[in-house]
Amino acid sequence: MIYLDNAASTQIHEDVLTSMLPYLKEQYGNASSIHRYGRMSRKAIEKSRKQIASLINADPSEILITSGGTESNNTVLRGIPMVNASSNIITSSIEHDAILEPCKQLSQNGLEIKYLQVDKFGMIDTSELKNNISDNTCLVSIMFGNNEVGTVQKISKISQICHEKKIPFHTDAVQTIGKIPIDVKELGVDLLSISSHKLHGPKGVGALYIKNGIRIDPMILGGGQEHGLRSGTENVANIVGFGKACEIAKNNLTENMAYVTKLRDLLIKKVLDGIPEVTLNGDPKSRLPNNAHFTFLGVNGEDL
């Protein structure tokens, strides 16, 4: 079988699995405990935090470990402080449901949500973004790379616009992490969501980059783990696996990106040249290396 659904999930890397096993068998201490087993777990978590941070050029203190992209996105949308009673959030019409569904509920609770439309390639109009920002805007959230058509947004430009207006900018980079280089300092983003299982790590763990100085109110309260931003006993094995996956992704990013891009372009050429009435969806140039999305006229997608 040829697996072509890596946008949905990836196979766990053998080295990732190996790194996790000791924390499922022998090193089972609670990271909040002060005894030796607890200290070993804490040390493993902090090492992983550094590995995660290194992949996106963040400081380890800026990494909040979560259960995945969905929780990271919800944490931002529900945790960002409101400007006033008339606050609004700006996002796009083609976000993942992990953004759209919380926005829908927030809207039902009285918060104004502004949805930016996209062009035929799935790209937002940055001029429209500028025009929609007001004194009441408390957050802009635009997906980095689209999970369906693969379009990569102009993140640096969006960051610049938001910073000129002094608005925090969040991007959902779950589909982008490990596929193309991400440097949060260079991009200028304030908040960024990532997930382990999209880059050959385990499911059920992810992270939220929170730039130093950005305030987020906690969504999960309890024992005060993750500097009080996400309470709950840490899943040490999964966090260790996530860290290892980030390390592997960083070490192989340039080589893998070139190889996958070459395969993608070959697939696109073969399909467009060899099959009639086919349309390539998404931006033809600004797209994820691992994404090729087509419409075959008269053919149901599920049947295909």
Locate the predicted segments by residue.
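Pyridoxal 5′-phosphate
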Residues: 1-304
